[in-house]
């Protein structure tokens, strides 16, 4: 159990400045966001004697920027991309320095398909006693068919390149996975 009775409450201030706009009769969207985060007593789970333990990690001071775009190149096709950059004075577990995503969506009547590639670099999986970072590339794919007004059949594949990576040290993420099912919306 990661329980720790000596934990102090987290304190955090977050400042953001963002701008977004739609152009070309709503077919093109872009946005940018700048942020600054300052806090202390952040809680993270670390491994102590092979077991997880929640601890206060001290200060956090991050700043960065995010940008995203989307463009309907055709009524059935949409391109999307986003990028985020994060500078960390005090590294945090599961926080990447850079993340880039690009994808394409297709929708026609009852059919919907999407695919995208995500590149992550400088993701901290451990910070104590020694910093450890991961870099990886993921490819995901999803398709669905609307069978009625409240239900969709779906199939999806995640990490289709079967990348070996961890978000938290000691906990490997699954390689390629596929699943299907029914989504019911009430």
For each feature predicted by the language model, list its residue ranges.
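Outer-membrane beta-barrel proteins
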Residues: 3-9, 20, 53-57, 69, ...
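A generic beta-sheet turn/junction motif
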Residues: 23-25, 106-110, 149, 186
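Outer-membrane beta-barrel translocator domains and adjoining extracellular loop/strand segments
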Residues: 1-2, 42-50, 82, 86-95, ...
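C-terminal beta-signal and adjacent terminal beta-strands/loops
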Residues: 38-40, 74, 119-126, 141-186
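Membrane-embedded beta-barrel scaffold of Gram-negative outer-membrane proteins
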Residues: 9-63
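Residues on the lipid-exposed face of transmembrane beta-strands in outer-membrane beta-barrel proteins
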Residues: 17-21, 65-71, 81, 102-106, ...
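Residues that define the transmembrane beta-barrel architecture of outer-membrane proteins
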Residues: 11-15, 36, 59-63, 96-100, ...
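Gram-negative outer-membrane beta-barrel transporters
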Residues: 31-40, 55-123, 152, 161
